[in-house]
């Protein structure tokens, strides 16, 4: 296990002194210098400069591309260390012939714009950021603009499905995510993780009832965390925004995912790792089934034994939660890279 691995404390939800984790990405492991064949590009959004980080194959000509949308939180994806799963994923895809791009969030790394945790940093800005990156990627002379894919992780597909409605992607990979509403997911996630950690049913029910009352005010009534906590201090954990703006999470909770996915008619690969405690197989199968109900045959589902939420190998969901507490993670699941790259290659070979 890598003891250098760190987790943002703002990206965890503590209830009953136990760790309850939503769809997040961990704080990445940073290297002192960028990986070979890494390029940087500045893109503009609302007059502010944002940094795009690109990896590119050594060979000349136009290449297919993968645009990464990460999970919940405020962090930079620049200068990832070689042991970071996302470094290995993006490097592996580049070795398979794909250009990759990720754009640092506003206020993170060298990206300008409003602070990542400010009310101005909402879902609409996140969508703008990805669209600006995709348009810059498509304009690059080393990218085949007709073969650009989105790879979105965790909460990323909830942003990505909006992006894919406005940019013609070749396909979409939705990794470790959800298919139902955020509010439903939050309640079920609390219950499920309490069971994973060994809590009794009555305690789980009591906790979920508190969470539901608090989050109804937050997600449905659109009260701010400060307004809620003035009268209900017991809601502190329930309205934790995991370091991002409350406006972003309220807009995420407003999404009707079935309505949004119905608008996207491209091949979709939905993946789930069996050691992931931040979502579950039924949720990801639900997403694949939903997409296929609207666009028959478009969605595929792949399950990865012993893979955790961070695309790392661990023996169980509980072990993954315990590793996070100790600021550790397992090795990257190379099978995930292989299957994703094979799926990309297959869709490249297929006729449009």
Predicted regions and their residues:
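Conserved alpha/beta-hydrolase "acid-adjacent" motif
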Residues: 277-285
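Accessory cap/linker subdomain of secreted extracellular hydrolases
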Residues: 173-263
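N-terminal cap/lid segment of alpha/beta-hydrolase-fold proteins
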Residues: 33-61
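Primarily recognizes the serine-hydrolase "nucleophile elbow" in alpha/beta-hydrolase
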Residues: 136-196
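Conserved alpha/beta-hydrolase
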Residues: 88-112
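Short beta-strand/loop motif that positions the catalytic acidic residue
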Residues: 264, 270-272
């Amino acid at each position: 296990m890598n003891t250098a691995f760190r987790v943002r404390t703002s990206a965890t939800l503590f209830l009953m002194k136990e760790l309850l984790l939503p769809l997040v990405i961990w704080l990445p492991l940073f290297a002192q210098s960028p990986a070979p064949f890494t390029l940087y590009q500045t893109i503009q959004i609302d007059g502010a400069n944002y940094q795009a980080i690109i990896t590119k194959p050594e060979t000349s000509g136009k290449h297919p591309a993968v645009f990464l949308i990460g999970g919940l939180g405020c962090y930079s994806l620049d200068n990832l260390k070689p042991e970071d799963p996302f470094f290995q994923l993006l490097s592996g895809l580049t070795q398979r012939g794909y250009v990759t791009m990720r754009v640092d969030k506003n206020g993170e790394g060298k990206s300008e714009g409003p602070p990542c945790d400010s009310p101005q940093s909402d879902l609409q800005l996140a969508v703008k950021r990805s669209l600006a990156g995709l348009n810059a990627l498509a304009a690059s002379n080393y990218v085949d603009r007709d073969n650009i894919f989105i790879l979105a992780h965790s909460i990323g597909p909830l942003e990505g499905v909006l992006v894919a409605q406005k940019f013609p992607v070749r396909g979409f990979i939705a990794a470790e995510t959800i298919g139902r509403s955020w509010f439903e997911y939050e309640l079920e996630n609390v219950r499920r993780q309490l069971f994973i950690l060994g809590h009794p049913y009555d305690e789980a029910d009591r906790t979920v009832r508190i969470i539901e009352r608090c989050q109804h005010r937050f997600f449905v009534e659109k009260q701010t965390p400060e307004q809620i906590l003035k009268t209900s201090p017991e809601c502190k954990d329930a309205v934790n925004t995991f370091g991002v703006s409350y406006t972003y999470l309220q807009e995420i909770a407003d999404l009707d995912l079935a309505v949004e996915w119905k608008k996207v008619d491209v091949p979709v690969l939905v993946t789930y790792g069996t050691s992931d405690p931040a979502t579950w197989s039924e949720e990801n199968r639900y997403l694949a089934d939903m997409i296929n109900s609207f666009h028959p045959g478009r969605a595929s589902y792949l399950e990865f034994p012993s893979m955790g939420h961070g695309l790392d190998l661990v023996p169980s969901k509980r072990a993954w939660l315990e590793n996070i507490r100790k600021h550790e993670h397992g090795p990257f699941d190379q099978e995930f890279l292989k299957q994703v790259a094979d799926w990309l290659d297959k869709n490249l070979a297929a006729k449009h």
